């Protein structure tokens, strides 16, 4: 089974869209969707519980330890699938790429598959220029400091074998830095991974509530 882990903060307007997209696109894959509320100031938690109350494969958790890192630690511990894919609640990443992730990690007997928006065959739509420049500077810096042949650490969208992530717990980063911590631990422990091109779309509704620190 595939566990899809989505941290949510102040995403009331996106929740219906999230559920709709997964229901439409993952009918042939046994999966669970784990929504972890991270100290939302709106009624995200209440709406998530209402939307998911009659859906057996949807789970809603409330993070008591504030921060994106705490939300992901909770979601990973609570997952039941053999594989865990982390996605952000804006669904900027393509669910069709999620299906490719799932096929590749099983077929090639991998421990992880990392997506990159910045390799051949990837497509990026409407990425704000300022954010794009900062992204490339940061990822280039990380690549050379840690001597890793990977250029998109800041993208959350990755899939892992569940036992790999659980063996690496706990993750200590409290903010967006966790998306650097997790793949670096996978690489440094010698786990087997591949990188594949992905499509990325700037979010359609609202603004991101998780900030890079």
Which residues does each PLM region occupy?
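Donor nucleotide-sugar binding loop of glycosyltransferases
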Residues: 11-14, 40, 68, 94
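Short, well-formed alpha-helical segments that are part of the catalytic scaffolds
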Residues: 11-25
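Acceptor/aglycone-binding surface of glycosyltransferases and processive sugar-polymer synthases
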Residues: 63-78, 83-86, 95-176, 202-213
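Conserved donor nucleotide-binding strand/loop of the catalytic core
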Residues: 31-34, 45-78
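A conserved acidic beta->alpha catalytic loop
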Residues: 37-46, 91
